[in-house]
Amino acid sequence: MKDFTTYLSTAPVVAFAWITITAGLLIEINRFFPDPLVFSF
């Protein structure tokens, strides 16, 4: 188990998880607010 946690903390795995979370967040924001350029405050 120690080797597995060491693998999960390596830079490519952490970068992949970070990019995946960021992409998912952007996709969901764009799903609920499709075009923020048309918001008139």
Curated annotation (Swiss-Prot):
GO term, biological process aspect, one: photosynthesis
The keyword Cell wall biogenesis/degradation is annotated on this UniProt entry: no
Protein name per the record: Photosystem I reaction center subunit IX
Residue stretches spanning the membrane: 7-27
Cellular component per GO, a single term: chloroplast thylakoid membrane
Organism from which the protein derives: Oedogonium cardiacum
Origin: domain of life: Eukaryota
Pfam families referenced in this protein's UniProt entry, alphabetically: PSI_PsaJ
Cell compartment(s), UniProt: Plastid, Chloroplast thylakoid membrane
Membrane topology classification: Single-pass membrane protein
Family named by the database record: Belongs to the PsaJ family.
Its biological purpose: May help in the organization of the PsaE and PsaF subunits.
Alphabetical UniProt keywords: Chloroplast, Membrane, Photosynthesis, Photosystem I, Plastid, Thylakoid, Transmembrane, Transmembrane helix
Coiled-coil annotated spans: none
Lineage, broadest ranks: Eukaryota, Viridiplantae, Chlorophyta, core chlorophytes, Chlorophyceae
Coarse class of the protein's main subcellular location: plastid
